[in-house]
Amino acid sequence: MNSPLIEEMSYLCTHNQIRQTMKKEIYLAGGCFWGTEHYFKQIQGVISTEVGFANGYTDNPTYQEVYTDQTGYAETVHIEYDEQVVGLEFLLNMFFKAIDPMSLNRQGHDEGTRYRTGVYYVSDDQLPIINKVFAEQQALYPQPIAVEKLPLRNFYTAEEYHQDYLDKNPDGYCHLPTALFVFARQAKDTTK
């Protein structure tokens, strides 16, 4: 017979293994990553966020290098989420509420290829959902939407001062309106 401590440890190990399998990830470029990160941090089921640079062609870029628009990178948020609480389809629909999908290389006052919008996936298993949401969004516009849909080629974490920027600097610059953060905080994936 096992002791209560061993049974509890066994339960916790099994529970943690199950929880790990429910953790999924997606990379979203929605203009300036400060606001995009803060927006997604408000959504129930988002476990963690990390800002950085995706799908460029240099190694270990700095913010100053990316800012030149000579590296091919997009400011991007790496999002880990609990699939039991929030699904990819919900997150993508929330993403489209926070961007102007018709704007090429610009969101708000921020302009340049680093501010382009994109969905960068880590598994082909994500494509059916991504394609569905893209088709629904495209149906709303007469011209093609300007949102990239590509596999993630690379991602480099941005410097520490960019991480959780709007938490550390509540009055800092953001291209997204405050009301959008309130909306995200109240939003819930009702399919879960």
Where are these regions (language model features)?
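Flexible coil/turn and secondary-structure edge motifs
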Residues: 6-192
